Amino acid sequence: LLAMAQISFDNQKYAASRKYFYQYLENARHTPASLWLGILLENRSGNKNRVASYVVLLKGKYPDSVEAALLKKMQDSGQL
């Protein structure tokens, strides 16, 4: 489901991506990849509270991940 959410996001099918993402969360724990996708999805929809929650989780649980580095770049560039 996470892969389908990512593919949908990459194809700019954001509603489908959110659907797959939330179905994924019903059955799985967050990974760096799921937190990153959650940040992107929620940032796109303007949900600042969820973005902030996912940012805290990503930085706290996976500070050395590729996704945390992507987050830092996004924050440094002012995109988040």
Where are each of the predicted segments found?
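Short, low-complexity, Pro/Ser/Thr/Gly-rich segments in the mature regions of secreted, periplasmic
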Residues: A68-Q79
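"A position-specific structural signal for the A-helix of alpha-solenoid helical repeats
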Residues: L1-A3, W36-L37, M74
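Alpha-helical adaptor scaffolds
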Residues: L1-E26
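TPR/TPR-like (Sel1-like) alpha-helical repeat modules
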Residues: Y22-P32, W36-V66
